[in-house]
A protein has these predicted regions:
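Hydrophobic hinge/microswitch elements
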Residues: 64-67, 133-190
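Short helix-loop hinge/linker segments at domain boundaries
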Residues: 1-24, 39-44, 89-93, 114
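Flexible hinge/capping segments at coil-to-helix
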Residues: 86-128
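Short amphipathic alpha-helical coupling segments at ligand-binding clamshell hinges
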Residues: 34, 211-223
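Beta-alpha-beta core module
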Residues: 89-95, 100, 161-211
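Secondary-structure junction motif
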Residues: 31-34, 80, 119-120, 124-148
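Central regulatory/effector-binding core of bacterial HTH transcription factors
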Residues: 16-82
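Short helix-loop capping/hinge motifs at secondary-structure junctions, enriched
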Residues: 109-118, 196-198, 209-216
Length: 231
């Protein structure tokens, strides 16, 4: 569709070509924020940008089929062997941007909110929130660390806004990178470090032999600003 629009611009409407760029990402707030900054910098009078928050396997498909320019996901000790194999089989390449220690997202009045560190055992009484992965509901494609640990209460969602509502209304939690700007939900959502020994290696996937465009390089610059060691 995007290619058809570009051809129409060139040969039918005789207008200047649109600036184009696309990203498929796991459900991270910071990837969306970085995309906003990219559009502010490079969005001219005419552009066609694409931002898709989706499941892990769909990200790989989008990059492989060139639906988007690059994909954002994480590797960990838990999923790395299988994920690297799948990435290689799809003729893709993963490059790390930065690493982050896992945190638990909770609402500010949650019974665990005052703890300096939370363990998986502490979380057992509360509903766990996981993003839906469609037909690829496997620990290796999960967006949440430790999703292989059985729990009594679990809610699967496909919308980041729903996750926030369930945190606020049900004392539910999710496990992610801890990168969550406060202005997105006031002071209502907080992140608490998880005691478990694991690291999220957040990075991007490209097709083999694909060179980053200037927009791609600029987007990665924006993403790096959210690295946990940045002030």
């Amino acid at each position: 569709i995007q290619q058809m629009e570009l051809l129409e611009d060139r040969y039918v409407t005789n207008l200047p070509g649109k600036v184009t760029f696309g990203v498929s990402s796991q459900h991270y707030t910071f990837t969306e924020n970085a995309f906003v900054e990219l559009v502010k910098r490079f969005g001219q009078e005419r552009y066609a940008f694409y931002y898709n928050e989706t499941g892990t396997h769909q990200i790989l498909d989008d990059v492989k089929n060139r639906v988007c320019d690059l994909g954002i996901l994480y590797l960990s000790h838990e999923n790395e062997i299988v994920m690297r194999k799948v990435i290689e089989e799809n003729h893709l390449v993963f490059t790390e941007l930065f690493s982050a220690k896992p945190h638990v997202f909770l609402q500010k009045d949650h019974p665990l909110a005052s703890k300096k560190v939370v363990s998986v055992h502490d979380l057992a009484p509360y509903p766990r929130l996981n993003f839906v992965q469609g037909e690829y509901e496997s620990v290796y494609f999960s967006e949440e660390l430790f999703s292989s640990i059985p729990v009594d209460k679990e809610i699967r969602v496909n919308d980041r806004g729903a996750i926030v509502n369930f945190m606020l209304g049900l004392n539910a939690y999710t496990i992610s990178s801890g990168i969550f700007p406060k202005y997105l939900n006031g002071e209502n959502i907080i992140s608490v470090p998880l005691a478990e020994n694991e690291t999220m290696h957040i990075g991007y996937v490209l097709n083999e032999n694909q060179e980053l465009s200037e927009l791609g390089k600029s987007y990665l610059e924006e993403l790096r600003k959210y690295a946990p060691d940045n002030p």
